[in-house]
């Protein structure tokens, strides 16, 4: 009798050819998690991980010798989930891989007819301008909702919330504190992802502290030094967005400094 994986091949989302922490195994597994969070439904969203490919070495006559003498340095590879597919069903073989010069070095089997994500150029900006190790493009409904709270706003602001401590400050290279005023740029949506490149780059330049960019009526891009950090930051943002929406419903400004905050806590904080 055939096992479940033979009856439904899409359930096989792990390849024994690669380590557990390799992007070919991580990306399908995490895409399924992000789908369950509502970030990747309807084939939306995108995900990428930077991976340091280590050239193999062998021990010979008590000296370490690289197998590949033509390139003596470790190489960075960038793995991307494909576009327009059921993200919860992605397989290890379905990924696109680019080198540090943004040249495609591997792609899915041709018979699958998978497409490269239009998010790739934006991902590469996060890699090159922020030193990211992973980037999530989420279609979170909370990110969309906070972009609509004030449709003239070019920023989302929130302060004095514990989960702000889960957000990395790209300028100070430290995590934010509870009393910090967290500011995230909001850019306008466009018909095609390619049209977002210029405003996205401007947001990165104008907001050196941010680890995310919100796209109005669309979603957000969020990054971190590792996939673990990126995932945790994205979850923290989602919590804060939801919280801000609920606060607005009861007439509380998420960006307002509380009257009863201890003065010592707020020394040096933005007002």
UniProtKB/Swiss-Prot annotation:
Binds 1 zinc ion per subunit. It comes from the Eukaryota. Keywords: Amino-acid biosynthesis, Cytoplasm, Lyase, Metal-binding, Methionine biosynthesis, Zinc. GO terms for biological process: L-methionine salvage from methylthioadenosine. It is found in: Cytoplasm. The keyword Metal-binding applies. GO terms for cellular component: cytoplasm. It is an enzyme of class 4 (lyase). Zn(2+) binds at residues 137, 139, 218. It holds the Pfam family Aldolase_II. It catalyses: 5-(methylsulfanyl)-D-ribulose 1-phosphate = 5-methylsulfanyl-2,3-dioxopentyl phosphate + H2O. Substrate binds at residue 119. SMART domains: Aldolase_II (SM01007). Its cofactor is Zn(2+). Pathway: Amino-acid biosynthesis; L-methionine biosynthesis via salvage pathway; L-methionine from S-methyl-5-thio-alpha-D-ribose 1-phosphate: step 2/6. GO terms for molecular function: methylthioribulose 1-phosphate dehydratase activity; zinc ion binding. Its EC number is 4.2.1.109. Catalyzes the dehydration of methylthioribulose-1-phosphate (MTRu-1-P) into 2,3-diketo-5-methylthiopentyl-1-phosphate (DK-MTP-1-P). Belongs to the aldolase class II family. MtnB subfamily. This is Probable methylthioribulose-1-phosphate dehydratase. It comes from Nematostella vectensis (Starlet sea anemone).
């Amino acid at each position: 009798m055939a096992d479940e994986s033979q009856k439904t091949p899409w359930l096989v989302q792990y390849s024994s050819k690669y380590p557990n922490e390799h992007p070919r195994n991580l990306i399908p597994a995490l895409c399924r998690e992000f789908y369950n969070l509502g970030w990747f439904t309807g084939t939306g969203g995108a995900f990428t991980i930077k991976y340091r490919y280590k050239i193999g070495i062998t021990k010979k006559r008590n000296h370490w010798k690289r197998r590949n003498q033509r390139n003596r340095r470790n190489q960075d590879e960038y793995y991307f989930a494909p576009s327009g597919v059921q993200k919860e069903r992605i397989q290890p073989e379905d990924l696109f891989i680019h080198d540090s010069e943004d040249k495609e070095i591997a792609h899915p089997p041709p018979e699958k007819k998978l497409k490269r994500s239009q998010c790739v150029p934006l991902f590469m900006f996060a890699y090159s301008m922020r030193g990211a190790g992973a980037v999530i493009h989420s279609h979170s409904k909370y990110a969309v909702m906070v972009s609509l709270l004030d449709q003239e706003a070019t920023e989302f602001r929130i302060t004095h919330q514990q989960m702000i401590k889960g957000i990395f400050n790209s300028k100070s290279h430290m995590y934010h504190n509870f009393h910090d005023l967290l500011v995230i740029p909001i850019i306008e949506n466009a018909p095609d992802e390619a049209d977002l490149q210029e405003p996205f780059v401007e947001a990165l330049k104008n907001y050196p502290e941010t680890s995310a960019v919100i796209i109005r009526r669309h979603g957000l891009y969020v990054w971190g030094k590792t996939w673990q950090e990126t995932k945790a930051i994205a979850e923290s943002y989602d919590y804060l967005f939801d919280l801000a929406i609920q606060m607005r419903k009861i007439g509380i400004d998420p960006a307002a400094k509380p009257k009863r905050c201890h003065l010592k806590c707020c020394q040096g904080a933005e007002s």
